[in-house]
Amino acid sequence: MRVALVGARGHGARHVENLVRLGHDGLATFVGVVDVADVDVPVPSYPDLPSLADELHPEVVVISSPPATHRDLVLTAFELGCDVLVEKPAVLSLTDFDEISAEAVKRGLVCQAGFQTQGTGSYRRLCSLIGSGALGEITGIGAAGRWVRTDSYYERAEWAGRQGEDGTLVNPFAHALQNALLLADVEERTDIAVELELYRCRDTITADDTACVRVTADGAPPVVVATTLCATTSLPPVVLVHGTLGQAVWWYDDDRLTVNDHRMAVAPSVDLLENLIRHRQTGEPLVAPLAAARAFTSVAEQCGKADVPLLPARRVGDRVLLDGIDEVVVRAAEKIATFTELGCGFGR
């Protein structure tokens, strides 16, 4: 299939590498890119998607541009008759989510969201364990994200650190939130309740750099995700599945899963673009359909509107540290508790 890429810099560079690989494997033809800057790619570059489509006629468009541009680009791709793989967050409001979903159905097209950890073997194995009852009744899903980030992190793009487009739950730890919602089986529900505690330790940003969210729904285990970019030491993001018969610990970035401290064998990962192409060719189910990002989009939209108070923190060179947060985010995931319930000085 003929594939075009919108946004070839930053994370988009990974898509360039993947498209070149798929071309060598004979699975896709990488026809061109759209980018506002000059980019070093082995295919023609265009200033906008219609111009590219007029000459190159893509069948699939991969979108890896700033989040605020996603809605318009997805709709443009649909108008051109293309299926879409769009990076997370796919969209920033439920209104946009519903509009894109309806347009896809109307045109007979598909939209895959860029939650690549849904394609990992560890995710599929964990879903199987939960479904089989191996962990017993699931009593809660916790996730913790703890990274060290310097000032340069917020200088990488104009939208970085901007509320409504960035934030720990919406961007760097979006996978933690999405994975927890999936494992709680609430990803498509419209009746979730969301409790947010968002904070920022830098006065140069408007989005949160430290956050906790609890998501609940009738008949589903509670979800708590706690995150920070103001840690003293980084920790690979982790999802904890608490059950009456045991606990699963999933390090999704490493495709690693343990159950009651035993390492589980997992199948190879599935590439999202390969999956989308096979969906079109053979009917293989999509790994990360947009429909499965409804609850995530609801939380993301609320993050864009919530208060984000400034916390006192320590500056150490080009880093900002929030004392105590390293332990707090882990405890929140372990206890399925919010910052406030843990008695943090900065909890509400």
Positions of predicted regions on the chain:
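N-terminal Rossmann-like dinucleotide-binding module
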Residues: 1-42
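Internal alpha/beta domain cores that form substrate/cofactor-binding pockets in large enzymes
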Residues: 2-4, 31-34, 44-47, 52-56, ...
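Glycine- and charged-residue-rich phosphate/anionic-cofactor binding loop of Rossmann-like
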Residues: 28-30, 282-295
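Active-site regions of enzymes building and remodeling cell-envelope glycoconjugates
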Residues: 42-48, 260-263
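Beta-strand-loop-alpha-helix segment that lines the small-molecule cofactor/substrate pocket
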Residues: 60, 66-67, 71-118
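Predominantly a Rossmann-like dinucleotide-binding segment in NAD(P)-dependent oxidoreductases
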Residues: 120-197, 201-203
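Contiguous beta-strand/loop segments that form the cofactor/metal-binding neighborhood of enzyme cores
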Residues: 171-286, 300-304, 316-348
